[in-house]
């Protein structure tokens, strides 16, 4: 496992939860909750500033896949958000990780901590980011980093897909990180 701070982002339609881990990558902790700012992207700028201030080696972004594993409208919005982060802080890789059960895990943890449903709103996004990041750290310690990394030159990024057993295959991805098959150049 690579050492270094990772920042996790749980993006919702109204709020964005942030979590970070220690430099050894052992434990995830809540950072704060941001208010979404779709018109001006102040939330994205705050994420970039937080990543730089902490010297993050990676940003983990929750990808809300459908229960069948497909990318529905929520996942497409998250992919667009990932692209904004990549453009805002290009020196830090963004890893897209399946977050299907992170909010459920966050609710369970908050209930176990004795919080009431009314108190959840302020912290549930942070808690979901903690669940997402801790699962990512735990998986990476086994040698199988989950999800895929969005990185590369503007407009044409490579996404590294992890399959069973941790083997990866490279595919071209669009600006939002969505995989596309390679186009063969020079055929004619």
UniProtKB/Swiss-Prot annotation:
<keyword id="KW-0378">Hydrolase</keyword>
<dbReference type="InterPro" id="IPR006641">
    <property type="entry name" value="YqgF/RNaseH-like_dom"/>
</dbReference>
<keyword id="KW-0540">Nuclease</keyword>
<dbReference type="GO" id="GO:0004518">
    <property type="term" value="F:nuclease activity"/>
</dbReference>
<dbReference type="GO" id="GO:0005829">
    <property type="term" value="C:cytosol"/>
</dbReference>
<dbReference type="InterPro" id="IPR037027">
    <property type="entry name" value="YqgF/RNaseH-like_dom_sf"/>
</dbReference>
<dbReference type="Pfam" id="PF03652">
    <property type="entry name" value="RuvX"/>
</dbReference>
<dbReference type="InterPro" id="IPR005227">
    <property type="entry name" value="YqgF"/>
</dbReference>
<dbReference type="GO" id="GO:0000967">
    <property type="term" value="P:rRNA 5'-end processing"/>
</dbReference>
<comment type="function">
    <text>Could be a nuclease involved in processing of the 5'-end of pre-16S rRNA.</text>
</comment>
<dbReference type="InterPro" id="IPR012337">
    <property type="entry name" value="RNaseH-like_sf"/>
</dbReference>
<comment type="similarity">
    <text>Belongs to the YqgF nuclease family.</text>
</comment>
<keyword id="KW-0690">Ribosome biogenesis</keyword>
<feature type="compositionally biased region" description="Basic residues">
    <location>
        <begin position="154"/>
        <end position="163"/>
    </location>
</feature>
<protein>
    <recommendedName>
        <fullName>Putative pre-16S rRNA nuclease</fullName>
        <ecNumber>3.1.-.-</ecNumber>
    </recommendedName>
</protein>
<keyword id="KW-0963">Cytoplasm</keyword>
<feature type="region of interest" description="Disordered">
    <location>
        <begin position="144"/>
        <end position="188"/>
    </location>
</feature>
């Amino acid at each position: 496992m690579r050492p270094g701070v990772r920042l996790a982002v749980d993006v919702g339609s109204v709020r964005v939860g942030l979590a970070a881990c220690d430099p050894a990558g052992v434990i995830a902790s809540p950072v704060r909750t941001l208010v979404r700012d779709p018109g001006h992207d102040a939330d994205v700028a705050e994420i970039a500033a937080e990543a730089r201030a902490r010297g993050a080696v990676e940003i983990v972004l929750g990808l809300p896949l459908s229960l069948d594993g497909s990318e529905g409208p929520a996942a497409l919005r998250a992919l667009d958000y990932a692209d904004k982060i990549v453009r805002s802080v290009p020196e830090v890789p963004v890893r897209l990780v399946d977050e299907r059960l992170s909010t459920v895990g966050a609710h369970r943890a908050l209930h176990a901590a004795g919080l009431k449903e009314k108190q959840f709103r302020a912290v549930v996004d942070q808690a979901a980011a903690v669940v997402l990041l801790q699962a990512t750290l735990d998986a990476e310690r086994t040698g199988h980093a989950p999800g895929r990394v969005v990185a590369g030159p503007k407009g044409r990024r490579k996404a590294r897909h992890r399959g069973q057993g941790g083997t990866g295959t490279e595919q071209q991805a669009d600006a939002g990180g969505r995989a596309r098959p390679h186009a063969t150049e020079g055929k004619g």
